[in-house]
Swiss-Prot record:
<dbReference type="InterPro" id="IPR012675">
    <property type="entry name" value="Beta-grasp_dom_sf"/>
</dbReference>
<keyword id="KW-0833">Ubl conjugation pathway</keyword>
<dbReference type="InterPro" id="IPR015221">
    <property type="entry name" value="Urm1"/>
</dbReference>
<feature type="modified residue" description="1-thioglycine">
    <location>
        <position position="109"/>
    </location>
</feature>
<dbReference type="GO" id="GO:0032447">
    <property type="term" value="P:protein urmylation"/>
</dbReference>
<keyword id="KW-0963">Cytoplasm</keyword>
<keyword id="KW-1017">Isopeptide bond</keyword>
<comment type="function">
    <text>Acts as a sulfur carrier required for 2-thiolation of mcm(5)S(2)U at tRNA wobble positions of cytosolic tRNA(Lys), tRNA(Glu) and tRNA(Gln). Serves as sulfur donor in tRNA 2-thiolation reaction by being thiocarboxylated (-COSH) at its C-terminus by MOCS3. The sulfur is then transferred to tRNA to form 2-thiolation of mcm(5)S(2)U. Also acts as a ubiquitin-like protein (UBL) that is covalently conjugated via an isopeptide bond to lysine residues of target proteins.</text>
</comment>
<comment type="pathway">
    <text>tRNA modification; 5-methoxycarbonylmethyl-2-thiouridine-tRNA biosynthesis.</text>
</comment>
<dbReference type="GO" id="GO:0005829">
    <property type="term" value="C:cytosol"/>
</dbReference>
<dbReference type="GO" id="GO:0031386">
    <property type="term" value="F:protein tag activity"/>
</dbReference>
<dbReference type="InterPro" id="IPR016155">
    <property type="entry name" value="Mopterin_synth/thiamin_S_b"/>
</dbReference>
<comment type="similarity">
    <text>Belongs to the URM1 family.</text>
</comment>
<dbReference type="GO" id="GO:0005634">
    <property type="term" value="C:nucleus"/>
</dbReference>
<keyword id="KW-0819">tRNA processing</keyword>
<protein>
    <recommendedName>
        <fullName>Ubiquitin-related modifier 1 homolog</fullName>
    </recommendedName>
</protein>
<feature type="cross-link" description="Glycyl lysine isopeptide (Gly-Lys) (interchain with K-? in acceptor proteins)">
    <location>
        <position position="109"/>
    </location>
</feature>
Length: 109
């Protein structure tokens, strides 16, 4: 899978909710919740959505959110209130109406 995302992959159709908490929202312009369009006629993996978030919504340092093709350690990911480890992580197939929550556990001080 290449690093470029096809604009048609995540466009039109249904939506998913993406939420950031624990400071992760600062990487996305301070906005905690985003409604992301999802083309319900195509299979879209969470990995593709991560690239889409990086390319379209991320305003901070990408290295603080992503490491290679996944979320960096220290950021918990919940898919519909379930740990993404139980859902297939980046291979999870997004469904219309999904709620994806990113919680940063990294705190400065």
């Amino acid at each position: 899978m290449d690093d470029s995302i096809d604009e048609e992959v995540i466009s039109g159709g249904s939506t998913i909710t993406v939420e950031f908490s624990g400071g992760a929202e600062t990487l996305f312009g301070g906005v905690k919740e985003h409604i992301v369009p999802l083309d319900g006629s195509k299979i879209v993996l969470l990995e593709e959505m991560l690239r889409w978030l990086r390319d379209h919504l991320l305003t901070g340092d990408a290295g603080l959110f992503l490491q290679e093709n996944t979320v960096r350690p220290g950021i918990l990911v919940m898919i519909n209130d379930t740990d993404w480890d139980l859902m297939g992580e980046t291979e999870y197939i997004l469904q219309p109406g999904d709620h994806i929550l990113f919680i940063s556990t990294l705190h400065g001080g």
